[in-house]
UniProtKB/Swiss-Prot annotation:
Heterooligomeric complex of about 850 to 900 kDa that forms two stacked rings, 12 to 16 nm in diameter. Molecular chaperone; assists the folding of proteins upon ATP hydrolysis. Known to play a role, in vitro, in the folding of actin and tubulin. One of its GO terms (biological process) is protein folding. Signal peptide: none annotated. This is T-complex protein 1 subunit beta. Keywords: ATP-binding, Chaperone, Cytoplasm, Nucleotide-binding. It comes from Dictyostelium discoideum. It is found in: Cytoplasm. Transmembrane segments: none annotated.
Amino acid sequence: MSSQLAPIPILNQNASEERGEIARLSSFVGAIAITDLVKTTLGPKGMDKILISASNPNELIITNDGATILTKIYIDNPAAKILVDISRTQDDEVGDGTTSVCVLAGELLREGERLVQQKVHPQTIISGWRLALETARAALQSSTQDHSSDKVKFREDLLNIARTTLSSKILHTEKDHFANMVVDAVLRLNGNTNLDNIHIIKKSGGSLRESYLDEGFILEKKIGVGCPKRLENPKILIANTAMDTDKIKIFGGKVVVDSMTELAKMEDAEKEKMLNKCKKIVDHGINCFVNRQLVYNLPEQYFAEHGVMSIEHADFDGIERLALVTGAEIVSTFDHPELVKIGTCKLIEEVMIGEDKVIRFSGIPSGEACTIVLRGATSHILEEAERSIHDALCVLAVTVAETRTVLGAGCSEMIMSKAVDELAAITPGKKAMAIESFAKALRQIPTIIANNAGYDSSELVSQLKAAHHQGDKKAGLNMRDGCIGNAEELGVIESFKVKQQVLVSAHEAAEMIMRVDDILRAAPRQRSNLQH
């Protein structure tokens, strides 16, 4: 009789399992592959990616935004999906650092894989990383600056943060122009971090330089035929209602009539209902009617005769924003005018942007609403420009709420790396190896930035490391000249909250993947045909 029983299968035949080192290696390989995919987009001289839809080859995206790249590609590896999730979370939380968080997590796992091969237990690595994280976070906090009490200096900080964010985007050639634009837009919010008050519209034609900030709300629709094209101090009613009351047409019914006279009576009755609804709307005392749905010729004519500006087919996002900035409410019934909140502004007028007519609402009551009008040669340029502007707006909104800033250009990473190295020097045992690996992963950020710019990264990073160990806490990478410079003088400033979020999220993702020692792929549940 055999002294050892054969393993008993407990999984369904369609399920699969990876255990121990194989599972861990699979996780490492997937995460590192994702890191290698996006790391070439990092930094002011990062490269772009072209994403082509599998279902529609004509649909393509040109971008270097980490979150956009990762969310648009199909990924099967579970560890890689975790990095995609943290990149998406980074984008939702602070708007920037989506590539950095993925790269840092991947570099931590690359170092972790090397330690595992040297027989360092994953729990030892995790313990060392936790100690390193606390030290790095403390070093980052000690390097912060806060100029919120000085409006001039704080605005300059915001401009530098915007320039830093835009320097790696398609807008880098006009980063000063766009930095001023987004800073003005965010400061108009007066401390409010709700970016719904800032509307972005894209109009093909012209160049990126021709983009501008309009101090009002622009709706990409046309005013009804025969209606007033300009109104001062208007009363605005915003609705989401069907102007057609023809229930036969709406519900697809059929009616049999004996004569054309009866058919004419039915049409007259429907027109009467429609005009009654128009009368109720006009009785609100308004002179501007904005509807999400269609306004037919008959109601449009009625509104024109009564001096009411009618705007139809306003998209839902547009009327939500318009209601927010004008102080109105979106209504669908008109029986109780006294309960309806009417919006207002100083001026409504039809203006031209390029070859298109749009409607501008100026003198918004809150004074916060504004519109960024983007111009560009192609739709691909405009889409990428919008993503870049969105990232910059999010970072600035975060900075207005959390006013502390840190230096960029690899300076913050080197400050944290130096502190972590000092911790490793006084830590006994294999845990010191894990702490050292954390410092190496942090140094990979400036290394990759230098590599992407075409410089000798080994030389530059060693010079940067030496400068910090000699006490120069403001030393950073000068990517314009390929040398070491003063990050503060270079104006490379980043939000403390963004940098801290990158550090914490990357560590959490790397630790989660490091803990994995088993990957189970369950079989799909079989659905049997039930007979009744």
